[in-house]
Regions:
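Catalytic domains of riboflavin
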Residues: 1-233
């Protein structure tokens, strides 16, 4: 989407050293992606009701932790704010607004709905079994322009970092996750024989899909499939 490279960590592991590394070596804007559920729990409103940003990045109001903070900008204090965002016991009262950390609200469904770094961050921490809060920071080259995938080799080697693309994450999720749930199954007798009708709901957008099945489906035999995008005929 942005065609930029980001450093990403889980928010609960946001040590002062990690935030200082991002500020020193990545040098982009340090943001804190949150799942929509987490953003709602912390009552973080969007920064603007009319998002005109090129990529529709969903910035919420900026925050600082409400306790043990002076100005909020140091690596240590930003790391405290970020870890508090990930703390499942934290509430809206544990933050002040505005602040020096920029939460980003991910869309439901993650990278399968929006192929952005916000969603990639949340998908990765969820896959790791961690709290749905992360940290991301764009990587800038020495000349101040944004690093692309072809620029990352020396950076990765120097600091011992692993890399993946949003496209790889999308491919992995499509291969490993079930994207629908069975809602109901009914028998459907017709003039052309007895069918079974299955109703499925998409986890991504709530869309409903019908599958009409005639006969027995066997895993060791090919099955004839016809797809209708609008109506059943």
């Amino acid at each position: 989407r942005e065609n930029e490279a980001d450093l990403i960590i889980a928010a609960e592991f946001a040590t002062p050293e990690a935030i200082n590394f991002m500020a020193t070596h990545a040098r982009g804007l340090i943001c804190a992606p949150l799942s929509p559920e987490r953003a709602d729990t912390l009552q973080l409103p969007l920064m603007t009701s009319v998002n005109r940003e090129n990529m529709s990045t969903a910035f919420t109001v900026s925050v600082d932790a409400a306790h043990d903070i002076t100005t909020g900008i140091s690596a240590g204090e930003r790391s405290l704010t970020i870890r508090t965002l990930a703390d499942p016991k934290a509430t809206v009262n544990d933050f002040v607004q505005p602040g020096h950390v920029f939460p980003l609200r991910a869309v439901p469904g993650g990278v399968l709905r929006r192929a952005g770094h916000t969603e990639a961050t949340i998908d990765l921490v969820r896959m790791a079994g961690l709290q749905p809060a992360g940290v991301c920071c764009e990587i800038m080259k020495d000349d101040g322009t944004m690093a692309r995938i072809g620029d990352l080799g020396p950076f990765q080697k120097k600091y011992g970092l692993k890399a993946c693309t949003v496209a790889q994450l999308i491919e992995h999720r499509r291969a490993q996750e079930k994207q629908i749930r069975l809602v109901e199954t009914v028998k459907m007798p017709t003039d052309y024989g007895d069918f079974t009708c299955h109703l499925y709901e998409s986890h991504l957008d709530g869309a409903l899909h019908l599958a009409l099945v005639h006969g027995e489906i066997s895993a060791d035999k090919p099955t004839l499939v016809r797809v209708h995008s609008e109506c059943l005929t």
